[in-house]
Structures are given as C-alpha cells and as structure tokens.
Design a protein with these regions (language model features):
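ABC ATPase NBD Q-loop/coupling interface
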Residues: 69-83
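Conserved ABC ATPase "signature" region
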Residues: 122-140
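Conserved ABC ATPase signature
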Residues: 144-148
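Conserved catalytic motifs of ABC-family nucleotide-binding domains
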Residues: 165
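Catalytic Walker B motif of ABC-type/P-loop ATPase nucleotide-binding domains
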Residues: 169-172
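Conserved beta-strand-loop-alpha-helix hinge in the C-terminal portion
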Residues: 222-238
C-alpha cells in the first residue's frame, strides 16, 4: 500500500517527564488512511496518552519523550509538527479547557481559528453555520460559551476542531458529558463524516463498533489487540 494512504505506528513509546514508567510501550500497528479507528481499554490503559501522541501534543505542548514512528498518510508529527498540526483537529477530555476563553458567543468561538487564518468573513459565516448545524448548536450561536451545558461544550469543542476542515481528527472521549440523545446524535453525525482519518476514544463500545473500521485495544500502555471490531472482540472473549 502507498504509505500516503496508510496509518503506520512503529515501536511507539511515550514517557512523561519526571515519571519513570512509560505511558505507551512499543506500539506497532497499521491501518488505512481515511478510516475510523476506535481506541478502547481500561482506566490507565494509555488511551489519552495515545491521543496526545497522535495529536502531537506530546512533546510540543506537554513535556515528554516520544520515540518510534507516527505516520498518518503523508503527515507525521515527528517530522513536521507545524504542517501536521494544521491538518489535525483535536478534542480533549476537558472540552472547556480547549476553548479560547476570548469569545463572547458560541459563533465567535467556532470562528476563532478561521479569523486567525485570515479566512474571508463570508466564508467564516457559512462554515460556522454549517458546523453548528451539524452538531446541533444552531440555537446556541448567540449564547456565551460559559452558559452551555457540559455536553454542549463538548459539541462546541468538536465544532472548533472541524471548522478548519482538517484531514485528521483525534477525539478523546468526546461524548463523556453528553446525555443519551446527545451521544446518539454525535455517533450519527460521525457516520456521515467523509474523507477524514478519525481516532476516537470512547466508553460507548457498542456505538464505537458500529462506526469504527478498526478497534485498537490498550492495556497498561501496550497494544494487545487490533483489527476489525468483530475480529477483535471474538479474540478477546475468554
């Protein structure tokens, strides 16, 4: 397979500064670019650390040592962080923490990165309305972000991540604060997303299996299974 159409992790390890134990240990796996990769595992399995590595957050923002290879299509955070970052949308576990804090309204928050990129005003308005509609935030565009519920803030974080049209999405438990209807809407939306490579951590395993092309299972920082959902869960059965 052309490596520009492949996700390739080889011997990936991550250790945070000041912590002796590695959070990720020698992970090697391949998948197809443009697929949805579901990441599951128990508490402290390394799911968030893998998201941070895939997003390039470690070591550029959070101090740590990353060794091995991360290649997502033609992009790699190891080789060109700036170019990789421009094509990557990230949603962290704490959605409020990744909002700018500078926007008066939900619409302004969604538009924040587009404004910084110098996108024309008419395009900004169109793209903001589009992603707000996709994520069920159309009625909240004139509200202050601080007035939103936890689930709405998660949807706002997703909106800010996708409005720049990245080719890679890294979503770390993006539905943890959503109610059942919100989660259902999110996974229905995710099915409709095209031409993006999506890495998603979720405890909603049944929903994840419905939409994921591959499941990666982590345990104590190691990859213990990877493959199509049915294959993986048959393998994990006692």
């Amino acid at each position: 397979m052309d490596n520009r159409q492949q996700i390739h992790l080889e011997n990936l390890s991550l250790r945070y500064r000041g912590i002796e134990t590695s959070a990720l240990k020698h992970i090697s796996v391949d998948a197809e670019f443009g697929h949805v990769i579901g990441i599951i595992g128990n508490h402290h399995a390394g799911k968030t650390s893998l998201c941070r590595a895939l997003a390039g957050i470690v070591p550029t923002i959070i101090s740590g040592d990353v060794t091995g290879t991360i290649q997502v299509g033609s992009l790699s955070p190891n080789l060109d962080w700036q170019k990789y970052n421009q094509q990557t949308g990230v949603v962290l576990q704490n959605p409020a923490g990744q909002l700018s804090g500078l926007a008066d309204t939900v619409a302004d928050e969604i538009a924040f990165d587009l404004i910084n990129q110098g996108v024309p005003a008419d395009q900004i308005k169109r793209r903001v309305l589009n992603v707000a509609d996709q994520l069920g935030l159309g009625d909240q565009l004139n509200q202050s972000p601080g007035t939103l519920s936890g689930g709405q803030k998660q949807r706002l974080a997703i909106a800010t991540a996708i409005v720049t049209d990245p080719s890679i999405l890294v979503l770390d438990d993006p539905t943890s604060e959503m109610d059942p209807l919100g989660r259902q809407h999110f996974f229905s939306w995710l099915v409709s997303v095209e031409k993006k490579t999506i890495f998603i951590v979720s405890n909603e395993v049944d929903d994840l299996c419905e939409i994921a092309d591959q499941i990666w299972v982590l345990k104590a920082g190691e990859l213990v299974a990877a493959g199509k959902p049915l294959t993986v869960f048959n393998h994990l059965k006692p």
